[in-house]
Swiss-Prot record:
GO biological process, one term: biotin biosynthetic process
Name of the featured protein: Sigma factor SigB regulation protein RsbQ
Protein's organism: Bacillus subtilis (strain 168)
Gene designation: rsbQ
Listed SUPFAM superfamilies: alpha/beta-Hydrolases (SSF53474)
Known outcome of mutating H247A: Loss of energy stress signaling
Length: 269
């Protein structure tokens, strides 16, 4: 067991089951974002939680701009953790960009993963008409990066509300906002650039691991057209429409998230 890797990514292992399930956070979040979901799987699974380098309680000294200027560096971190824990045929549950990171890892080392559960994923956030609508124009994303640089706290407030799309749930907005604010602003901006300007549409056809796509209602970050596109181009995928609104069902609707993941695992694992 490589303790250096486990320390770098602040890896936590819980549960007592034989099967392994790994939970990956989305942009700007750490492993605690899964607090309302992950414990439900501890009875039957070995649950693995981790932080991206630069987030949560990871080792900031390990951050390397060249390594993490694309999602490939984060995907390698996932593979490093799998190897450090000697994981095989692991269920990978990723939120948002975390889902794409897991997907890229599975392309490199498919034998390490049995299934992918992708919560609100998007292979490309930029519109590319007429074939593809990711939800954003380039100037919108450039504006997001500019706001992060000029007023990070203000950006965190606005972006948390936009992502959640839960105006009647201020406590959840404050929780997500605090997670954004706890991340190093420079690293967060670089991660945002790597995530929101990436285009992994051509990688979808390379995936051989079966997957479940969980599509939220009224998701501004990953709209329904994106979920359908992924399902059409991702081999061995299933698409499930959630009742949950917004982009963070594991925070706003944990019970539904647990139910849908559990149902998929019972039927396919």
């Amino acid at each position: 067991m490589n303790e250096a890797i486990l320390s770098r990514n602040h890896v936590k292992v819980k549960g007592s089951g034989k099967a392994s399930i790994m939970f990956a956070p989305g942009f700007g979040c750490d492993q605690s974002v899964w607090n309302a979901v992950a414990p439900a799987f501890e009875e039957d699974h070995r649950v693995i939680l981790f932080d991206y380098v630069g987030s949560g309680h990871s080792d900031l000294r390990a951050y390397d701009l060249n390594r993490y200027q694309t999602l490939d560096g984060y995907a390698q971190d996932v593979l490093d953790v799998c190897e450090a824990l000697d994981l095989k045929e692991t269920v990978f549950v990723g939120h948002s960009v975390g889902a794409l990171i897991g997907m890229l890892a599975s392309i490199r080392r498919p034998e390490l993963f049995s299934h992918l559960v992708m919560v609100g994923p998007s292979p490309c956030y930029l519109n590319d008409p007429p074939e593809y609508y990711g939800g954003f124009e380039e100037e919108q994303l450039l504006g997001l990066l500019e706001m992060m640089e000029k007023n990070y706290i203000g950006w965190a407030t606005v972006f948390a509300a936009t992502v959640l799309n839960q105006p009647d749930r201020p406590e959840i907005k404050e929780e997500l906002e605090s997670r954004f604010c706890s991340t190093d602003p420079v690293i967060a901006r670089q991660f945002a650039k790597a995530a929101f300007f990436s285009d992994h549409r051509e990688d979808l056809s390379k995936v051989t691991v079966p997957s479940l796509i969980l599509q939220c209602a009224d998701d501004i970050i990953a709209p329904a057209t994106v979920g359908k596109y992924m399902h059409q181009h991702l081999p061995y995928s299933s698409l499930k429409q959630m009742e949950a609104r917004g982009h963070c069902p594991h925070m706003s609707h944990p019970d539904e998230t647990i139910q849908l993941i559990g149902d998929y695992l019972k039927a396919h694992v």
